[in-house]
Curated annotation (Swiss-Prot):
Protein name: Acyl-[acyl-carrier-protein]--UDP-N-acetylglucosamine O-acyltransferase
GO biological process: lipid A biosynthetic process
TM spans (from-to): none
Annotated pathway: Glycolipid biosynthesis; lipid IV(A) biosynthesis; lipid IV(A) from (3R)-3-hydroxytetradecanoyl-[acyl-carrier-protein] and UDP-N-acetyl-alpha-D-glucosamine: step 1/6
Subunit structure: Homotrimer.
E.C. number(s) listed in UniProt: 2.3.1.129
Primary location class: cytoplasm
Lineage of the species this protein comes from: Bacteria, Pseudomonadati, Pseudomonadota, Betaproteobacteria, Burkholderiales
Amino acid sequence: MAQIHPTAIVDPAAELADSVVVGAYAVIGPQVRIGAGTTIGPHCVIEGRTTIGVDNRFFQFSSIGALPQDMSHDGEITELVIGDRNTVREFCTFNTGTRKEDGVTRVGSDNWIMAYVHLAHDVRLGSHCVLANNATLAGHVHVGDWATIGGLSGVHQFVHIGAHAMIGFQGHVSQDVPPYMTVDGNPLTVRAVNLTGLRRRGFSNERIGVIRQMHKLLYRDSLTLEQAVEAVGALRGQQAEAQSDADIAVMLDFIAGAKRGLVR
C-alpha cells in the first residue's frame, strides 16, 4: 500500500504502486499513474494525464503535468510520460504536450534535473541528462541522451540538442547543438569536443579521435557546411572500431535533420 501523508490529497482514481511515498500537502490528480519506489515530496502537484515510472524522486513544490503554456491549446487531452530513476529537484515545472506533435511531453530515465527547471509542452528529454538550476526548455525542444545543460540556460522552441552535447552556463540556445560538442558564450559558439563527458562514458581514444576530426572539419577548417558534411561522410569505413562509424552516422543524421540551423 502506498504511504500517503494525512495532509496529502490523492484522487481515488489515481493509480499509485504499493511502495510510492507521497509527502505532506502534495496533490495527486485522477489521471495520474505512479510506479513503484517513487517519492513525491511535500507540496508537489502531479496532475493531468501523467504517467511516472519507477524509483523517481520529486522534491518539494514541483508542478508536474499542468496544461501547456500554449495559447492555441483549447483543452484537448494531452500527456506527460516520465521514465525511471529520475531526480527532480525543487520548483520544477513539466507541462503536458499539444496536438502540434503527438500530444506527449516525454522524459527519459536516469536524468538529474535541478531546481526551477522548466520543460514546456512537447519537449523530448532523453536519458542520463543533467539540467542545472533554472534551465528552461521551450516547446518542442528535443534533447539527446547524456546531454548537459548549464544553469540559467534558455533553449528556444524547436531546437534540437545532440547526444553528449554540453551547454555552458547561461547559454542562449537558438540553433541546433551538434552531438558531442561543448557550446558556450553569447552569442553561442562551439568551443570544443566534450572530452570530459565522453571519457567519463567510456569512449575509447579512437572514438574520441574521430569525433575530434569531425569537430575540426566542421569548425576549424573554414569549410562550408556542405563541404564539411561531405568530408565527415568520407571518414566512414576507415576506422578500426565499428562504433566510430556509428558516431559518424549520429553526427550526419543530426545535421541532416537540423531545422533551425547549426550552432557554428
